[in-house]
Amino acid sequence: MTPEEQLRIIKEGTVEIIEEEELLKKLKEGRPLRVKAGFDPTAPDLHLGHVVLLQKLRQFQQLGHEVFFIIGDFTAMIGDPTGRSQTRPPLSREQVLENAKTYEHQVFKVLIPEKTTVVFNSTWLEELGTKGLIELCAKYTVARMLEREDFSKRFKEGIPIYIHEFIYPLLQAYDSVAIKADVEIGGTDQKFNLLIGRDIQREYGQEPQVCITLPLLVGTDGVRKMSKSYGNYVGITEDPKTMFAKIMSIPDEIMWDWFLLLTDYNKEEIEKMRREMHPMEAKKLLAFTIVKRFHSEEEARKAKEWWEKTFSQREFPEDAPLVKLNEKKLRAVDFLVKIGAVKSKNEARRVIQGGGLKINGEKVTDPNTEIEINGELKVKVGKKKFYRVVSG
């Protein structure tokens, strides 16, 4: 494959390449490029938002390049200030290492193991020492840091910015120096940090990395970026049925971006699907493709059949969990908490008043309705939760 053909493939799904000419020049050198992406293990599981970056890394691997998956065990203890209106609480070493264990296992659901080098940035950052850290800090200015939108906003509003928050992007940049990165990939929110990497590499006498930014995946709500804190995520270790149902719940308008960012279908194939397929069938294909990647073709087939029976044909799932209650009668608001469908009475009220509770096919809209537990009740909560409830 020619360098120009590689560049065309790499550009698909990207927002910006800085600089494109530099990337083409590196590709023309005919050697495997050293491609880097860093992930701070601030939470124990990866979700599809992370997969956008992993998918692009895999693409580089398929083109013959070497991927460095950097687990930011050192930087996670500082906390990335990107997009923050206030200081991020630090994590303990124990929390970070526990989260990192799952990252090591989960990344190979996307990346090719033999073409991936997994490294912890504590390997070189702990060895940097006080002298090395001061030398690193001396290579950048506070004025340049304050050009960043989130820092600038906090500074103008009198919200404290702590010194360690300025140091974070410098340490991320030093990761690029440590592994001699040719390319770094990140979300659009990471652009400032990626560009600092170019500057710091120059300061250490290296050729600057090419920065590739990718879109932030919109979550299942169709509004905000995918995040566990927003509850709009699809975890890559979730069971096949949950994963399939969550994907089927996304708005049609974001489905095509998901195809582009999360699957191996190219733009031409996606455009053809958009013209020729019914949106429902296309979304089933998307859900099937993603579940297959993280589980198996057989599990994806079963999840699809289950979804069609349960949601499309409105059948109650036979394998819904059985919940036994001691009470014979409960108010609806207490009933939802007791069966474990919600965590609080306030949440139960919102679900009920929003029309999200059905018992034996009948909608319950008054939180104070008395529910008699006589025989087996078939309970549906929201779009995806099902329970069989009995007394005794």
From Swiss-Prot:
Compartments, record wording: Cytoplasm
Residues at which ATP binds: 228
GO MF annotation list: ATP binding; RNA binding; tyrosine-tRNA ligase activity
GO biological process, alphabetically ordered: tRNA aminoacylation; tyrosyl-tRNA aminoacylation
PROSITE patterns: AA_TRNA_LIGASE_I (PS00178), S4 (PS50889)
S4 RNA-binding domain boundaries: 330-390
Entry GO CC: cytosol
EC number(s) reported in the record: 6.1.1.1
'HIGH' region, short sequence motif: residues: 41-50
Signal peptide (UniProt feature, chain positions): none
Keyword Repressor: no
Pfam families: SYY_C-terminal, tRNA-synt_1b
Catalytic reactions of this protein: tRNA(Tyr) + L-tyrosine + ATP = L-tyrosyl-tRNA(Tyr) + AMP + diphosphate + H(+)
Short motif ('KMSKS' region): ranges: 225-229
Record keywords: Aminoacyl-tRNA synthetase, ATP-binding, Cytoplasm, Ligase, Nucleotide-binding, Protein biosynthesis, RNA-binding
Aminoacyl-tRNA synthetase keyword on record: yes
Family classification: Belongs to the class-I aminoacyl-tRNA synthetase family. TyrS type 2 subfamily.
Function field: Catalyzes the attachment of tyrosine to tRNA(Tyr) in a two-step reaction: tyrosine is first activated by ATP to form Tyr-AMP and then transferred to the acceptor end of tRNA(Tyr).
NCBIfam families, alphabetized: tyrS
PANTHER family given in the database record: TYROSINE--TRNA LIGASE, TYROSYL-TRNA SYNTHETASE
Subunit details: Homodimer.
Protein name as it appears in the record: Tyrosine--tRNA ligase
The gene coding this protein: tyrS
